[in-house]
Amino acid sequence: LQGEAKEKYRELTKNLSKLTLDFSENNLKETNNYQLTLTDEAQLAGLPESAIEAAAETAREKGVNGWVFTLHAPSYIPFMTYADNRDLRRELYMAYNTKCTHDNEYNNLEIVKKIANIHMEIAQLLGYDNYAEYTLKERMAETGDAVYKLLNQLLDAYTPVSYTHLTL
């Protein structure tokens, strides 16, 4: 790239870096702010003692009674793996998978839209029709058509096997 195009590329990548950082910071803040506080010992059914002790310690640190589970892996994974209470697992799962989508200061929707638009602008500036075409060019697939061809081959190969497993 030369001249204005080069300057535009610099501006876009600078904005992309800032937006990516903002996205990550929002994700971290939302993760840090969430807590599932349980006060009924029956709700801990199925959890290993180590997870219960860690949740009790987290509750003490936060100055609350009971047990606190967070979206951080050392708390989240044991809860999702071992907790008997399906409703509580669902609550924690939904909290984890809807981070930064709520109507609050950590919502990443606009950031994601801006990142997608910048990706498109960068791709077009470099002579590609879209960002997927740009990113695939340097990879094994090289084109979107090649990706779809591979996916269809996998589908053809694995569909009969999957039906066999369904009938078991």
Language model: regions and residue ranges:
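Conserved small/polar residues in nucleotide/adenosyl-binding loops
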Residues: T164-L168
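Extended, domain-scale alpha-helical bundle/helix-rich regions
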Residues: A146-S162
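His/Asp/Glu-rich acidic catalytic environments and adjacent acidic regulatory segments
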Residues: L1-E142, A157, V161
